[in-house]
Amino acid sequence: MITHAPIRYQSKFYFYENDYIIGASIKMYGEYTQVEVDLLKNYINSTSVVYDIGGNIGYHTVAFASMAKEVHSVEPNDRNYLLLEKNTQHLNNVKLYHCACSNVVGEAFISDYDTTQPGNYGECMMSETGQPCKTVRIDDMDLPPPDLIKIDVEGHELKVFQGAYNIISKHRPVIFYESMHGTGFDVIYDTLTTLGYTIYYFPAKNYNPNNFNGVEQNVFGGGGVINCIALPASHGKIAGLPEMCDRTDNYNIALGRFIKAKEKQ
């Protein structure tokens, strides 16, 4: 069932009632991983162009649209795209693309979910079966130069990077992507550091104590995701986040190194 609730960016935001992560967070807290938006807003202003690759039902897209000049949001799953359209239909600075970003132009499949059953609807990923979808390369999409690219594609990150290499190497945007080891994570590190990027880990808990609705109850426990934010040389450093120092690094190693360095100060 589709329902709606107010969020900090608009009075009605549509979501699926049975989604026990994104939907539950919107319903209870009026937001979803707002800590990610709070980090990324430091790199968005009224002239910024943002790509939201893996727009899902649009929370980040709507948030970005409140700050940026343009937001280009890509979502392949039909059910997600339906709500992405509903949630952004009043926003003149948002353009939507019903496809999947990859390293080839063609066709593929994206996993689906049953909205009559409880589930984590944010886990749609490229699959051998499921909904058919078109695949595109970001380099071929004729988009304006990006200032920020957010990528959340459940393990397909490397192929998105491969299909966007020309855009990234030419324009050096800030890039925010999910940390999924074993899916080309080391190759992404090599690619970005060769281009002069510095990569930091950014853990995002599902529960935000400063949530929009002011709810103190934490229904998610310690659940969340580990992300990476990659900054080009022109953006300097981030003092408060653990840096990824080589292609085999992981969050726990980087965090331990970060804590030890702080203790020595």
PLM-predicted stretches and their roles:
Residues 1-265:
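Phosphate/nucleotide-binding beta-alpha loop and adjacent structural elements of enzyme active sites
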